Design a protein with these regions (language model features):
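Alpha/beta-hydrolase superfamily serine-hydrolase fold, recognizing
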Residues: 1-220
C-alpha cells in the first residue's frame, strides 16, 4: 500500500500519518507513506498541484522499481489517500505508466482507495482561503481534475466519505462514481457518524466498515 496524506496540497506531512502503517501492515501489506512538496512553495521554487502529481508519479515509479527489496510485491500495489491524497490516488489509477517508464506496465496500478477525495478542482479557484496558497490556474484545475478525465481503462477505485462531512465532500464522493461509473468505482459509500478527520482514524480500527473495505480491496 502506498498512502498519500491530505492537507489540501498545502499542509501536513507523512509523519502526521504514520499511524496508518501498523494496521495496514497487520492486514499483510508492505506500507509506504509518501511525502510531497507543498503549495505554494517559494518564489524560487513554486509548487503547483500538477507538480505534486508529477512527484507522486515519480514516487510510484520508485515503488515499482524498489518495493520488492522491502518485502513488497510490485505487481500488487494499492494506492490510497485521504482528502488531497485521495485526489492524487485517483489520478495515479488513471495514469498511463508506459508514458512514464517503458519498463512499467501501462495499467500497473489496478486498485485505489480514496478517503474523502476531491475530483473536480475547478471550484477551488473561487475559494479564497485555498486559492491564496494553491494559485490554481484554469488550465491547472482542468489538468488535475480526475472527474474531467475519461475513466481508467482498467482498475477499480473505492471512494468513501464521512456521513458528517460537508455537502461539498459528499458531492465529490458521488461525482466520481457518476462520471467514471460503477464498473470503475464499484464502491461509493458515505460512512455514518464520521467527519473529515475521524474517517482517517476509522481506517486503523478493526471491525469498522472502512477497515473491512480496505482489507477487501487489498485482497491479502
Amino acid at each position: 500500500v502506498v498512502f498519500i496524506h491530505g492537507g489540501y496540497w498545502r499542509s501536513l506531512d507523512k509523519a502526521d500519518h504514520s499511524f496508518v502503517a501498523p494496521p495496514l501492515h497487520d492486514m499483510g501489506a508492505c506500507v509506504v507513506v509518501v511525502n510531497y512538496a507543498l503549495c505554494p512553495g517559494t518564489t524560487e521554487s513554486p509548487v503547483t498541484i500538477p507538480d505534486i502529481a508529477h512527484q507522486m508519479v515519480k514516487a510510484m515509479a520508485w515503488t515499482w522499481q524498489n518495493i520488492a527489496h522491502h518485502g513488497g510485491n510490485p505487481k500488487n500495489v494499492t494506492v490510497a489517500g485521504h482528502s488531497a491524497g485521495g485526489h492524487l490516488a485517483a489520478m495515479l489509477l488513471a495514469c498511463d505508466w508506459k508514458q512514464v517508464d517503458p519498463n512499467i506496465p501501462a495499467h500497473w496500478i489496478q486498485k485505489a482507495l480514496s478517503i474523502s477525495g476531491l475530483y473536480d478542482l475547478t471550484p477551488l479557484r473561487k475559494t479564497p482561503f485555498l486559492q491564496d496558497s494553491l494559485r490554481l490556474t484554469a488550465k491547472h484545475a482542468r489538468m488535475a481534475s480526475p472527474a474531467l478525465w475519461p475513466r481508467p481503462r482498467k482498475g477499480v477505485l473505492y471512494t468513501v466519505a464521512g456521513g458528517d462531512e460537508s455537502p461539498e465532500f459528499l458531492r465529490h464522493n458521488r461525482l466520481i462514481h457518476q462520471v467514471w461509473g460503477a464498473r470503475t468505482v464499484p464502491v461509493c459509500e458515505e460512512l455514518a457518524g464520521l467527519n473529515h478527520f475521524s474517517i482517517v482514524t476509522d481506517l486503523t480500527k478493526k471491525g469498522t466498515r472502512l477497515s473491512a473495505l480496505t482489507k477487501a480491496l487489498l485482497d491479502l
